[in-house]
């Protein structure tokens, strides 16, 4: 919906960006089950630059608790191993030729609680990002109303719409967090 020079769909898009970033961050949290998304945040020093692991290797899940990383270029194996170790995912690479195998250890109760805390931190960062977008939208509405580009009634109605979008997005963040928390705590 667009009124004057205010487009609420742009705010929705920016808020959805925060939830997509949260999904990406939560996907990188280890839950005790192998998932190729665990390695998405891993950056490899390759050819003089930082590259995502998925640009230098193929990641597969041959078993529920095993990741297999097929490195395309033999000269990159050591760099990929180092990137995995440096990523603080708690994984120990075992190399056989051009294949790096990563056993996913069982999570103990203490580690599960730590991961839940990290997930909560990610979710709070997403909520803060959503609130910043809301504040930007409300500030824009106030400026438009002050400059007489929209009426006071329109400003209040649109502010209410912005709040509804904010509430829905924060609810989505909370649902993503609850699902990840359940996944982490399930033994």
From Swiss-Prot:
GO terms classed as biological process: cytoplasmic translational termination
Name of a matching Pfam family: RRF
Entries under Gene3D superfamilies matching the protein: 3.30.1360.40, Ribosome-recycling factor
Record-linked InterPro entries: Ribosome_recyc_fac, Ribosome_recyc_fac_dom, RRF_sf
GO molecular-function terms, A-Z: ribosomal large subunit binding
Keywords: Cytoplasm, Protein biosynthesis
GO cellular component: cytosol
Top-level taxon in the UniProt lineage: Bacteria
Record localization: Cytoplasm
Keyword set includes Cell division: no
PANTHER family: MITOCHONDRIAL RIBOSOME RECYCLING FACTOR PSEUDO 1, RIBOSOME RECYCLING FACTOR
Family assignment from sequence similarity: Belongs to the RRF family.
Functional summary from the UniProt entry: Responsible for the release of ribosomes from messenger RNA at the termination of protein biosynthesis. May increase the efficiency of translation by recycling ribosomes from one round of translation to another.
Protein's name according to its UniProt entry: Ribosome-recycling factor
Gene: frr
